[in-house]
């Protein structure tokens, strides 16, 4: 089966909506290549963290510009995407709602918070699961795989979502006074786990703000 390929000029001329999915460090070079090929009606959606709508408009010199911050769940149509623009949003919302759920951000400054919560947070979860896997692999039999451990987390989350239960209530339903779960949780609380996790979110948010000033 043949796969069509297009030059950047052809893409800009043929597309109604153009998704620009590059890292922030590569965005301005790409905009420089694109700007001479952009018509005023082309809708351009950037997923680069930290690059403001104003900076995108200046770099592109044309088109209707949107910012979107999806997360990894979009690969499975389970993503959450925050969107900001001064343009009409219906078509863009339709695309990202197909990939999960789209959230309109009214204040562009808040998209930095959405970046840290929506875009970066899955990596924080993965790191916790990864460390959990390493420790359990030291303690459990060889026939317990990483996949089994990941499924442990996944089934717990599915249960919470399907039953609409409060996470605090789920924690209470698992732990018992003086038991193993309470001992582990107390160790987390005593070692400032909550603040460390909160500070990680703040660090991601602050970095997104720094990128917007570059």
PLM regions and their residue ranges:
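NAD(P)-dependent Rossmann-like dehydrogenase/reductase catalytic/cofactor-binding core
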Residues: 148-214
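Alpha-helix N-cap/helix-start capping motif
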Residues: 9, 24, 49-50, 108, ...
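Glycine/serine-rich anion-binding loops at beta->alpha junctions
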Residues: 70-74, 115-125
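A general structural signal for well-ordered alpha-helical segments in protein cores
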Residues: 15, 27, 31, 53, ...
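Internal alpha-helical scaffold of NAD(P)-dependent oxidoreductase catalytic cores
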Residues: 6, 55-64, 80-113, 123-163, ...
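Rossmann-like NAD(P)(H) cofactor-binding subdomain of soluble oxidoreductases
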Residues: 1, 5-83
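Short pre-catalytic strand/loop immediately N-terminal to key active-site residues, enriched for Gly-Thr
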Residues: 65, 111-116, 167-172
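A short acidic, helix-capping loop that chelates divalent metal ions and anchors anionic groups
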Residues: 75-79, 112-115, 183
């Amino acid at each position: 089966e043949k796969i069509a390929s297009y030059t950047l000029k052809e893409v800009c001329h043929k597309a109604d909506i153009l998704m620009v999915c590059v890292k922030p460090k590569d965005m301005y070079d790409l905009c420089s290549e694109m700007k001479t090929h952009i018509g005023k009606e082309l809708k351009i959606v950037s997923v680069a963290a930290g690059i403001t709508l104003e900076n995108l408009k200046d770099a592109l010199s044309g088109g209707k510009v949107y910012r979107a911050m999806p997360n990894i769940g979009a690969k499975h149509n389970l993503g959450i995407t925050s969107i900001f623009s001064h343009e009409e949003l219906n078509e863009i919302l339709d695309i990202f709602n197909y990939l999960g759920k789209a959230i309109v951000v009214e204040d562009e400054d808040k998209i930095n918070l959405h970046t840290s919560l929506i875009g970066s947070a899955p990596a924080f979860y993965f790191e916790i699961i990864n460390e959990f896997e390493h420790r359990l692999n030291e303690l459990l039999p060889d026939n317990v795989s990483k996949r089994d451990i990941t499924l442990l987390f996944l089934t717990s989350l599915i249960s919470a979502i399907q039953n609409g239960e409060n996470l605090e209530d789920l924690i209470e339903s698992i732990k018992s006074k003086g038991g193993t779960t309470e001992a582990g949780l107390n160790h987390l609380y005593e070692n400032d786990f909550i603040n460390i996790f909160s500070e990680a979110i703040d660090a991601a948010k602050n970095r997104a703000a720094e990128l917007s000033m570059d």
